[in-house]
Amino acid sequence: MALNRLVFSLSLWLGFIGAAQAASSEPLPPSKDPWYTAPPGFESAEPGTVLRVRPAPGNLTSITANSSASYNILYRTTDSHFKPTWAVTTLLVPELGPDSLAQQKFQQSALLSFQVPYDSADVDASPSYSMYSASNDSSAPYTAALGSGLFVSVPDYEGPLAAFTAGIISGYATLDSIRAVLSLGLGLNITNSPRAALWGYSGGAFATEWASELAVQYAPDLVAGPVVGAAMGAPLANITTFMHSVNGQATSGLVPNTLLGLTSQYPDVRKYLVSKLNDDSEYNRTGFLAAEGFTVTESGVAFAGIDINKYFQNGTDILNDPKILALVNREGIMGYHGVPKWPLFIYQAIPDEVTPISATDALVEKYCAVGADILYERNTVGSHYEETNNSYKAAVQWLEDVFSSQHDINRAQGCVIQDVTRNTTSGDLVRRKDVQKSVFDLWSAAW
């Protein structure tokens, strides 16, 4: 094992030197960038081992507010079959120095793992590439965190097969991204009891929750050490109810993305799924499989308002097909792989039209019955998308508590479930066009 670590360390830094020389080149989509491959023999490395690192190509640092440097890190992780695979995370470094917020507030030792809801079965939609064209709305949380002195890791948690809604690999890849960053440093003070927290909304909360419940068995080192908590909004607790909720609605494009993402690691189930598609009709195989190359926005346009069952022979109810349900039960139902040991803040709008709150209620009830530490806030107003703004402040304040150890004082509180009313989208606190500035102000006020 020591020899393997030595070999990987040598190849890593040789690769880093070469990458640094080419850092000014434009980013390539992962499917066309040879850097997105693991070196020979990576399978023998331990989960979380760094396999490659490079300064992020192109202008990512300059276009990401409050960032002083950015790196791509390719690391060893584990797929849903419990076999070695790899994933990539992008590490964003805040402004550093003796007078920086990173030093004054956190001694350069605080890491936020931010899971972006990229919700796509296309590997080229992975954050390490899509961040170059991210809107202010989607980048606001992590750029604001950078502005408050946090290091930010943004993992491509779906892995190299873009396994959207595959909970096992999503959780493992998220956990191993934290391990990889903490082993590497790159400005992060890893000798001064570093603290890490996770945050995600919707698809990003899906990965955040799976990481939290899998950590007990997969990453006890993170449970016992640096991870201090996880915040998650509208976490897609049950993928079956989620797909039924969005099918035929404006967000119907999430269904093909889910079915293709779920089956990307299961060739037999993918073959079965494809065999059930129509050969020729308005809703045919070609149209459905086009989602493999779509971002979530593109799928939203292509499939808006369509009952996805129309793509299947005789209108088959594919969402209730036994083979599909068996896979969902393995990969898409939370609460069956372990009880999170670090504190959780879970928030969701009661009227959520994308993922029914009843599934989140059931998950929280299950965890609370076995002693989990959860603050669960159910917002009486707002849609799925409005809740991203409505509960920004609450999430930021809760993360401030766990980073500053204030939550540790009150850990005996156990589960707290409460209905709240937050309607910041009306303009009282956060207007959509001003979300970047407002979220930065929230982080700044917290610390």
Curated annotation (Swiss-Prot):
Gene3D superfamilies noted in UniProt = 1.10.260.130, alpha/beta hydrolase
Q: Which N-terminal stretch is annotated as signal sequence?
A: 1-22
Q: Which residues are glycosylated?
A: 59, 66, 136, 189, 238, 284, 314, 389, 423
- Show the active-site residues: 202, 352, 384
**One Pfam entry name:** LIP
Work out whether the entry's keyword set contains Phosphoprotein: no
Q: What induces it?
A: Expression is positively regulated by the trichothecene cluster-specific transcription activator TRI10.
The protein's UniProt keywords, in alphabetical order, are: Glycoprotein, Hydrolase, Signal
Question: What is the E.C. number?
Answer: 3.1.1.-
Q: Which Gene Ontology terms cover its molecular function?
A: triacylglycerol lipase activity
In what pathway does it function? Sesquiterpene biosynthesis; trichothecene biosynthesis
**Claim: Phosphoprotein is one of the keywords in the record:** no
Listed GO biological process terms:
lipid catabolic process
Q: What does this protein do?
A: The biosynthesis of trichothecenes begins with the cyclization of farnesyl diphosphate to trichodiene and is catalyzed by the trichodiene synthase TRI5. Trichodiene undergoes a series of oxygenations catalyzed by the cytochrome P450 monooxygenase TRI4.
Other facts noted in the record for this chain: Trichothecenes are sesquiterpenoid toxins that act by inhibiting protein biosynthesis.
The family note in this entry says: Belongs to the AB hydrolase superfamily. Lipase family.
PANTHER family hit by this protein: LIP-DOMAIN-CONTAINING PROTEIN-RELATED, PTHR34853
What protein does this entry describe? Trichothecene C-3 esterase
Species assigned in the record: Fusarium sporotrichioides
Instruction: Name the encoding gene, please.
Output: TRI8
